[in-house]
């Protein structure tokens, strides 16, 4: 099988890293050889696979060694559950430098050291998603990842972020093979959430590849720094992640998305009761003015 490179984007706090590690565990359980490249300064993209608080990052190790040229691949590449290879790009100290730069440095280092030449079926990039700056767009921009999955929920800001990421994909699709492969709904138990994300997916010209229900077993597994598939393999939630990984394995639906305008997105949110229609008459009115108008 030819190497498939997939990037997972999504708003911060949406459960992107948890979802990525659980679906990758499902793919590994089915016999696939996988590498995860964490592209988030928090360096939490591999903790459930390695049972670790946080993996040493390429940027940290390079700083200790003197430069990235002084590193060996085995210094930064660790194997975890199911033989999954794990790398974290890391970033600079808060307030110093560009975190996106760490992603660029890490991917270049992995290429030069032959990490992609190993017998791999999939590479997954777990990418910080509401910052669509050059560094974080690296997996898209340099044609590293061809399949982009966006983790989303029925919350307004998660949908705004998904639409912005779709705009980024359009920008780079014309010069390469990058395509939107689907939305993964990580449920927040919002009313009509599955319908809303199906509608958003249709508007973007893609699919909701899977609806992952909310289940407390995810948190119980996380406390133990494990994926659900490893912690409780017979649970319903483990089967949900297996279903998601199987859908990704068989996915052939790769599109150049059709992002929504802000008005279209707000219309969609209003249609599903996520947002009230704007009342232009109250814009700019203070509480005192509103009270005076109400008693007039």
Swiss-Prot record:
GO molecular function: 4 iron, 4 sulfur cluster binding; ATP binding; metal ion binding; nitrogenase activity
Named cofactor requirement(s): [4Fe-4S] cluster
Binding site for ATP: 10-17
EC number annotated for this UniProt entry: 1.18.6.1
Cystine bridges: none
ADP-ribosylarginine, modified sites: 101
GO BP of this protein: nitrogen fixation
Residue numbers binding [4Fe-4S] cluster: 98, 133
Highest taxon listed in the record's lineage: Bacteria
Record note on cofactor: Binds 1 [4Fe-4S] cluster per dimer.
Record PTM text: The reversible ADP-ribosylation of Arg-101 inactivates the nitrogenase reductase and regulates nitrogenase activity.
Gene3D superfamilies xref list: P-loop containing nucleotide triphosphate hydrolases
PROSITE patterns found in the cross-reference section: NIFH_FRXC_1 (PS00746), NIFH_FRXC_2 (PS00692), NIFH_FRXC_3 (PS51026)
Catalytic activity: N2 + 8 reduced [2Fe-2S]-[ferredoxin] + 16 ATP + 16 H2O = H2 + 8 oxidized [2Fe-2S]-[ferredoxin] + 2 NH4(+) + 16 ADP + 16 phosphate + 6 H(+)
Record keywords: 4Fe-4S, ADP-ribosylation, ATP-binding, Iron, Iron-sulfur, Metal-binding, Nitrogen fixation, Nucleotide-binding, Oxidoreductase
Subunit record text: Homodimer.
HAMAP family found in the cross-reference section: NifH (MF_00533)
Function: The key enzymatic reactions in nitrogen fixation are catalyzed by the nitrogenase complex, which has 2 components: the iron protein and the molybdenum-iron protein.
PANTHER family: LIGHT-INDEPENDENT PROTOCHLOROPHYLLIDE REDUCTASE IRON-SULFUR ATP-BINDING PROTEIN
Protein name: Nitrogenase iron protein
Organismal lineage: Bacteria, Pseudomonadati, Pseudomonadota, Alphaproteobacteria, Magnetococcales
């Amino acid at each position: 099988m030819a190497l498939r490179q997939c990037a997972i984007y999504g708003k911060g706090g949406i459960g992107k890293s948890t979802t990525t590690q659980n679906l990758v565990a499902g793919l590994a359980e089915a016999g696939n050889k996988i590498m995860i490249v964490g592209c988030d300064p928090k360096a939490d993209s591999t903790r459930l696979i390695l049972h670790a608080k946080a993996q040493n990052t390429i940027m940290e190790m390079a700083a200790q060694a003197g430069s990235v040229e002084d590193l060996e691949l085995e210094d930064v590449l660790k194997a975890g559950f199911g033989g999954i290879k794990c790398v974290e790009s890391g970033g600079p100290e808060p307030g110093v430098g560009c975190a996106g730069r760490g992603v660029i440095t890490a991917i270049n280092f992995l290429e030069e050291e032959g990490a992609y030449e190993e017998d791999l079926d999939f590479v997954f990039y777990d990418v910080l998603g509401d910052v669509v700056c050059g560094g974080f767009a690296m997996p898209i921009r340099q044609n590293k990842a061809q399949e982009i999955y966006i983790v989303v929920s029925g919350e307004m800001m998660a949908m705004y972020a998904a639409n912005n990421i779709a705009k980024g994909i359009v920008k780079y699709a014309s010069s390469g093979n990058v395509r939107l492969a689907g939305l993964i709904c990580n449920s927040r138990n919002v009313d009509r959430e599955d319908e809303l994300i199906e509608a958003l997916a249709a508007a973007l010209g893609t699919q909701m590849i899977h609806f992952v229900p909310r289940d407390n077993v995810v948190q119980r597994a996380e406390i133990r720094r494990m994926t659900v598939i490893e912690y409780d393999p017979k649970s319903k939630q483990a089967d949900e992640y297996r279903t998601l990984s199987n859908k990704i394995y068989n996915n052939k639906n790769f599109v150049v998305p059709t992002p929504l305008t802000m008005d279209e997105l707000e219309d969609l949110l209003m249609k599903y009761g996520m947002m009230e229609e704007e009342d232009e008459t109250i814009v700019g009115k203070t509480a005192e003015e509103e009270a005076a108008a109400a008693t007039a």
